[in-house]
């Protein structure tokens, strides 16, 4: 990889992807690419990238666990705007300029759950995961990689069995270096 575009570099996983990178990484701040602002997505120059690593997301900040009934309209809109609408438009723009590249999407182990209190977050991650299925058939020269970690340690105290963001970053690079299309990372079954 010569030039990588990272979306979500301020997340814990994104920070560890940057720390462990062996290639040049461009990580535009939110004022340059804001997934809730289509004009910033449209205005970015996507030319010349070998790889997109998409780790941005909304709706599960630091273990947020809210029921469907308690979700307010701002939470719902923010989660869908970032995880679905913004992600879709960004992928459209990126793939238009780089149809023969690598696209890594760090999603969520929640895509496998059929029972969860966080309906909106989980549904948005299922949308993103399914969209990658469809894009793989459309962009056959693009190598798509999905990394779906279960609960990631996101500044929780006294929770040693959540997945370390460093391990997820290591998994991302392992998939890229070894042409692995999918990696599910989960915590021990007895937890």
Language model: regions and residue ranges:
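C-terminal helical subdomain
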Residues: 146-147, 158-191
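Conserved mid-core segment of classical short-chain dehydrogenase/reductases
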Residues: 57-77, 117
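Catalytic Tyr-X3-Lys loop
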Residues: 69-89, 128
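N-terminal Rossmann NAD(P)H-binding glycine-rich loop of SDR-like oxidoreductase domains
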Residues: 7-19
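Flexible, glycine-rich beta-alpha linker
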Residues: 112-116, 137-163
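Hydrophobic positions on the long internal alpha-helix
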Residues: 86-94, 131-132, 175
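Rossmann-fold scaffold of SDR-type NAD(P)-dependent oxidoreductases
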Residues: 7, 49-59, 83, 105
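Catalytic loop of short-chain dehydrogenase/reductase
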Residues: 102-127, 132-133, 137, 151
């Amino acid at each position: 990889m010569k030039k990588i575009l990272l979306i979500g570099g301020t997340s814990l996983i994104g920070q560890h992807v940057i720390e462990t990178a062996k290639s040049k990484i461009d990580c535009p701040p939110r004022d340059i690419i804001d997934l809730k602002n289509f004009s910033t997505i449209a205005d970015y120059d996507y030319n010349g990238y070998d790889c997109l690593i998409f780790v941005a997301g909304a709706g599960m900040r630091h273990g947020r666990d809210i029921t469907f009934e308690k979700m307010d309209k701002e939470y719902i809109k923010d989660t869908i705007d970032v995880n679905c609408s913004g992600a879709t438009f960004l992928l459209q723009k990126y793939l238009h300029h780089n149809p023969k590249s690598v696209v890594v999407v760090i999603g969520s182990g929640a895509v496998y759950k059929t029972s969860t209190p966080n309906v909106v977050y989980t549904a948005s991650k299922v949308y993103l995961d399914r969209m990658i299925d469809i894009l793989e058939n459309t962009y056959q020269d693009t190598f798509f990689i999905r990394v779906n970690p279960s609960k990631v340690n996101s500044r929780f105290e006294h929770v040693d069995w959540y997945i370390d963001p460093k391990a997820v970053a290591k998994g991302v690079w392992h998939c890229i270096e070894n042409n692995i299309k999918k990696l599910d990372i989960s915590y021990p079954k007895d937890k």
